[in-house]
Design a protein with these regions (language model features):
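Compositionally biased terminal segments of proteins
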Residues: 1-162
Length: 162
């Protein structure tokens, strides 16, 4: 659904006031949701397992916990900067009726000394002249305990799930 920047800001402000939450954090969550929805329309939708803060925030509510990034595990392909960059370009370029553009800023290795290395993606989410930085951490090999589930993620500004 297309919302103007003023509509997005207004809805975020109302939700922030109602939940005693930080509007900037809510704006970041909204932009992360826009990227997550693009994943659901991509051929990689079954390869990404969302975990961490954004998932917990959606389950317990924004007044209880906020998050700064999207944490995911991937499966079915090698975790290399080149492959992840290719995948992110495909996902970010999926057109939805939200007028949001994602600009890829950086792709870097994280957890170099860990058993399960990862990739960090830095994007800017742009809605006209409103620009919000977001991060996506992608890892592989982590055990998902007890196991991954299909989850209907409730969107912040719309009465629907992805």
């Amino acid at each position: 659904m297309y919302l103007t920047p003023a509509q997005v800001k207004g809805r975020i402000k109302n939700i922030a006031k109602k939940n005693k939450a930080d509007p900037i954090t809510l704006m970041r969550i909204y932009m992360m949701e826009r990227f997550l929805e693009r994943i659901t329309y991509s051929k990689y939708k079954d390869d990404f397992i969302v975990k961490g803060g954004i998932l917990v925030t959606s389950m317990i509510g924004i007044s209880m916990r906020s998050t700064m990034d999207i944490d995911t595990s991937i499966r079915n392909f090698d975790l290399t900067k080149e492959k992840i960059t290719e995948i992110i370009y495909e996902i970010k370029d999926i057109k939805l009726d939200d007028n949001i553009e994602f600009i890829l800023n950086d792709v870097s290795n994280i957890k170099d000394n860990m058993e399960y290395p990862g990739i960090r993606i830095h994007l800017n989410a742009k809605l006209e002249n409103l620009v919000i930085p977001i991060k996506i951490d992608i890892s592989t090999g982590d055990m998902i305990t007890p196991s991954e589930i299909k989850y209907e993620y409730p969107l912040l500004l719309e009465n629907r799930t992805i």
